[in-house]
């Protein structure tokens, strides 16, 4: 059975959907550990309740980001994890780390990439007058939110929507598509080659499976 590590910084709502999918068998894998860069992240409580090992790596305990990521990488390597899942991990990974685990890191980002990389995506979409938003699951590389797109889900933005309403609508889609992509990877159906995502041996378009 494949082993997953989940990296978090906060509430761990996406983590919970992954825990549930592993427990139900929808994802044929085991979560080997949950790692946080915040000691008070509620996601650590979720992991403890699910009897999943937890580890905390605080930036203040390392001289630089590279040293911290090396320590996390060594820990993950000692567990022989097959996949690293970023689920609200609010720290940019160093290029050395992303290269070390190339093709083995997935992230979910709350926008229809390449649109609105970075932070405050809901506010930016509303301020731009967009009539739709969404979320993207992608492989992670050295470029922030720039790796090969696997799957996207769109949601409407209505004229009177608040940021919170768009976020809630988007998160509901996240809880559907992230476990699905993780399932594809753990079943051996999804892989990265030459910075392109392949599903069942077929290269996905740049916008991912949903827009094929």
UniProtKB/Swiss-Prot annotation:
The record marks 145 as: Raises pKa of active site His. (6R)-10-formyltetrahydrofolate binds at residues 90-93, 107. It is an enzyme of class 2 (transferase). It catalyses: N(1)-(5-phospho-beta-D-ribosyl)glycinamide + (6R)-10-formyltetrahydrofolate = N(2)-formyl-N(1)-(5-phospho-beta-D-ribosyl)glycinamide + (6S)-5,6,7,8-tetrahydrofolate + H(+). Its EC number is 2.1.2.2. One of its GO terms (cellular component) is cytoplasm. N(1)-(5-phospho-beta-D-ribosyl)glycinamide binds at residues 12-14. InterPro entries: Formyl_transf_N, Formyl_transf_N_sf, GART, GART_AS. Pathway: Purine metabolism; IMP biosynthesis via de novo pathway; N(2)-formyl-N(1)-(5-phospho-D-ribosyl)glycinamide from N(1)-(5-phospho-D-ribosyl)glycinamide (10-formyl THF route): step 1/1. Pfam families: Formyl_trans_N (PF00551). The active site is at residue 109. Keywords: Purine biosynthesis, Transferase. Belongs to the GART family. PANTHER family: PHOSPHORIBOSYLGLYCINAMIDE FORMYLTRANSFERASE (PTHR43369:SF2). This is Phosphoribosylglycinamide formyltransferase. It comes from Haemophilus influenzae (strain ATCC 51907 / DSM 11121 / KW20 / Rd). The lineage of its organism: Bacteria, Pseudomonadati, Pseudomonadota, Gammaproteobacteria, Pasteurellales. The gene is purN.
């Amino acid at each position: 059975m494949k082993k997953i590590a989940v990296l978090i910084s906060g509430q761990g709502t996406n983590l919970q959907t992954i825990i549930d999918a592993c427990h139900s068998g929808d994802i044929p894998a085991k979560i080997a550990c949950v790692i946080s860069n915040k000691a008070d992240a509620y996601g650590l409580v979720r992991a403890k309740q699910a009897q999943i090992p937890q580890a905390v790596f605080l930036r203040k305990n390392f001289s630089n980001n590279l040293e911290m990521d090396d320590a996390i990488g060594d820990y993950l390597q000692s567990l022989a994890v097959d996949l690293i899942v970023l689920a609200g991990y609010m720290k940019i990974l160093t290029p050395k780390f992303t290269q070390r685990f190339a093709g083995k890191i997935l992230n979910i980002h709350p926008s229809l990439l390449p649109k609105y990389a970075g932070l405050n995506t809901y506010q930016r979409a509303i301020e731009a007058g967009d009539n739709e938003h969404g979320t993207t699951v992608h492989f992670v590389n050295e470029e922030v939110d720039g790796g090969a797109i696997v799957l996207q889900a769109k949601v409407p933005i209505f004229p009177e929507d608040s940021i919170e309403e768009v976020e809630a609508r988007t998160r509901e889609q996240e809880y559907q598509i992230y476990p699905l992509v993780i399932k594809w990877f753990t079943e051996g159906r999804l892989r990265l080659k030459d910075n392109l995502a392949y599903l069942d041996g077929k290269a996905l378009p740049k916008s991912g499976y949903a827009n094929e």
